[in-house]
Amino acid sequence: MEILRIEPTPSPNTMKVVLSYTREDKLSNTYKKVEENQPRFINQLLSIDGITSIFHVMNFLAVDKAPKADWEDILPDIKAAFSGESQVLESGKDPQIDNHFGEIKAELLTFKGIPYQIKLTSADQELREQLPQTYVDHMTQAQTKHDNIVFMRKWLDLGNRYGNIEEVMDGVLEEVLATYPESQLPVLVKHALEENHATNNYHFYRHVSLDEYHATDNWKTRLRMLNHFPKPTFEDIPLLDLALSDEKVPVRRQAIVLLGMIESKEILPYLYKGLRDKSPAVRRTAGDCISDLGYPEALPEMVLLLDDPQKIVRWRAAMFIFDEGNAEQLPALKAHINDNAFEVKLQIEMAISRIENGDEALGSVWKQMTNRTI
């Protein structure tokens, strides 16, 4: 058994260690102290100074450390527990950092288009929250005696969020209640009871003009417009540019998401506005969009993000430079080699190593998949 990769998680005190071995019993265990009946490698890890607990399931471990402990001291000992060496894994490869550091996936559970529960999933945690009771009541009203709610319910992908998972839940709840106001629930029930509800995209995709958007005073209505917006085109840029100046973070974030759908270098200046937003969630979302587009022209702007106060943003910048960078970015990378966030430091080291070794910049995983299909 050996380590395949080590991935950071949204918690600064937890690392995910992916193993070459998968448990056959499909069970999970949490270990907090050394005991004779535990696997030997678990006891070895628990003996490492600074490790407080280990969660083992399937093919990975979630290793927790004490808040004052340093990952830079702990990780060599974790490697040694599997390889017998302090610096090199048995596979001869350095651990690879995850492509989704800091992401929290947000999903909305719906039945016939009526929402009633939110789920957030991070690398090591899941959090659910039911919408107010009136949403559950209206969802129940939409059922008929022939409906099977288990088979008919659907999870809608709300995209990724960043930050403390409890705070993210508060923000997503606010967004959902704005997108699906209580006043619309009776209409949604009426629509759900119609036979063609499954194929009718009622009230979901509706294009709005710049004038209509500009005349809307309520931020919840503006957010609802953007959430129900069809795939944008160049003609929609003025509207989305206006939304980038909105006082509400969810509106600005959704504007960035929509701008990222316009797959052109001409959209980069607008995404750069997102990189300078006062909200780290908007800055990270803009960085993700730029990473997905994979235009090397964005390198100068992403290099500036290595000085961002938020590590989730600095990490995205370092990851983009790893994906797209060249020797021109080496001075900036080396100037930030001692980043105080271990995950960022590790990604910077990987970028430096890739460039100095002369390895080709392959681009993001998404870009590689796209190129492979051409």
Curated annotation (Swiss-Prot):
Transmembrane segments: none annotated. Keywords: Virulence. InterPro entries: ARM-like, ARM-type_fold, Nfu/NifU_N, Nfu/NifU_N_sf, PBS_lyase_HEAT, Virulence_F_dom. GO terms for molecular function: oxidoreductase activity. Gene3D superfamilies: Leucine-rich Repeat Variant, Scaffold protein Nfu/NifU, N-terminal domain. Belongs to the CvfC family. Required for hemolysin production. This is Conserved virulence factor C. It comes from Staphylococcus aureus (strain MRSA252). The gene is cvfC.
